Amino acid sequence: MIEYTIRDGFPKFQDLPWDYSLTNWPGLTDRLEEVQRGISRHPVVFVNYEGSLYAIKELPTGVALSEYQMLLKMQEQHLPCVEPVGYVQISTGNCQRSAIITSYLDLSLPYRSLFMHSNLGRYRDHLLDAIAGLLVQLHLAGFFWGDCSFSNTLFRRDAGALQAYLVDAETTEHHACPLSPMLRNHDLEIMQANIQRDVF
């Protein structure tokens, strides 16, 4: 059984091979696109509908719903994050899983691109400022990220600087705003550990 929850104004995504894990989609649909991507702990694919790209991430059952709801709350507060499109619950035989669908963030770059391409080197010094600025915005709005890292962020160039966008809200929680000092400090500790891992 496959259950779709998709926002109005977007494709229905019902022609995709949901009976199979995303890792098996190559060769099963001609909608797949290759784009620059960061590192993800879960399978991720990009699909093309009439020139618009969408990211699909496979998750354990139920997780896509919670991430979708968090992204909706962030979007309602005009926070910089990817646009949530919908989620899918899949139950095939003994296998249960879910998937979240988001709009592809045009003109964005994963942090590794800023290290791999010499012509983008001038932006590297702005990475920390950009992700720290994103974290401050989230905390002021009452969001605890729980997994702040370069890998869970995309960047857009903005007048010589960078704007950071949250792309992974699996561990995000919404609390009273502004966030408590204890949770803010915990998020900062997680960010420090994750960034050291990302870079080194």
Residue ranges of model-derived segments:
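N-terminal presequences and immediately downstream first alpha-helices
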Residues: 1-19
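Conserved ATP-binding subdomain of kinase catalytic cores across diverse folds
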Residues: 13-125, 129-146
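Surface loops and adjacent helix of pleckstrin homology
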Residues: 59, 158, 178
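Generic beta-strand structural signal
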Residues: 97-100, 151, 162
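Short, flexible active-site-adjacent loop segments at beta-strand->alpha-helix junctions, enriched
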Residues: 106, 159, 170
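Hydrophobic residue at the +6 position relative to the catalytic HRD Asp in the kinase catalytic loop
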Residues: 148-155
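Activation-loop N-terminal segment of eukaryotic-like protein kinases
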Residues: 155-161
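C-lobe/activation-segment region of protein kinase-like
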Residues: 162-200
